[in-house]
Each structure stands twice: as structure tokens, then as C-alpha cells.
Amino acid sequence: MFNPFQIFDLPVDFQLDEKVLNARYLKLQKALHPDNFVSSNALDQRVAMQKSTEVNDALKTLKDPILRAEAIIALNTGEQLDLEQKSTQDVAFLMQQLQWREQLEEVERQQDERALNAFAKEIKQETQSLLTALFESLKSQQWARASQYCDKLRFTHKLSEEIERVEERIFELD
């Protein structure tokens, strides 16, 4: 099973020291740089390229809190998360999603910058609250609950991206 923490010789923990992660990334990338393998055979070059790809994938996973949490869950449960088969069972959150989408559509329709800023702040606060709850769930090894928080965070992340697109469209019209 892919273990991004092992690649960087880090403990499996949601809280990371970004400076240590970045330093180890640079060290690994320097060691795997293609110039180091110019005189090597094709197999060694291919292996170095594969390892470099693994390092990049691991970095991407560890820098993204949702992917990092999902990696921790997978490492502890032995199960990879299949996003296509997952569906949110939290009816209240599904209703909240619909309400937020309608709210964003209304803000965009009205071209209301102040309402958009307030909405963006609300979603940012919700995301922060979900990250805190995710951290607590991981700490207490409640893997199913942590997975649910990942789902919710994935939604708020997408919604934040949509808010940014709406913001760009509103400011283009000004």
C-alpha cells in the first residue's frame, strides 16, 4: 500500500512539519535528478523516474489535508477509499449542500459582492471547523467518522473554488 509518510521518513500523523517535509522533498529530488543518471543504464533511469514520480505523488498527498487524512485512514484500515462508490449518508449535510448551492446561485444572479464575501467567509469557517473535527477523529482513531469529514471537506473545497469563479465573474462585469 502506498505510504507517503514512509517515502519522506515521517511519522503517520495528520500534523506535519512543512519545513521538514520540504527539506526532505528537496533532498530526494536532488538525489533522483535525471542528471545523476545520464550515464546509467535505461533500467536505472526508469527506476529513478518512477521513484521521482512517487516522491511527487507523496508530496501532493501530504500537502493536501484531505488526501493526507485519507492516506492515514487507508494505512490504518487497510482499505483504499473509492470515491466513485462513496456517497454521503449524512442527509442533513446533503440538505446543507443544496442550500449553499442555491445561496451561491442567488448571490451570482444578484451580482452582490458583499453577500459573496460573507458567504465565502461562512464556507471558510465551516471548512476550518471540519478540519478541526477531522483532526480530532483521526486522533481518536474514529476512521469512519474521519472519512465522513473528508467527504464534507471535499465538498467545501469544491464550493470554495466555485465561489472564486463567481467572484471572478462578478468582478469582470464591474
UniProtKB/Swiss-Prot annotation:
It comes from the Bacteria. Residues 3-75 form the J domain. One of its GO terms (molecular function) is protein-folding chaperone binding. Keywords: Chaperone. One of its GO terms (cellular component) is iron-sulfur cluster transfer complex. One of its GO terms (biological process) is [2Fe-2S] cluster assembly. The keyword Signal does not apply. NCBIfam families: hscB. Belongs to the HscB family. Interacts with HscA and stimulates its ATPase activity. Co-chaperone involved in the maturation of iron-sulfur cluster-containing proteins. Seems to help targeting proteins to be folded toward HscA. This is Co-chaperone protein HscB homolog. It comes from Haemophilus influenzae (strain ATCC 51907 / DSM 11121 / KW20 / Rd). The gene is hscB.
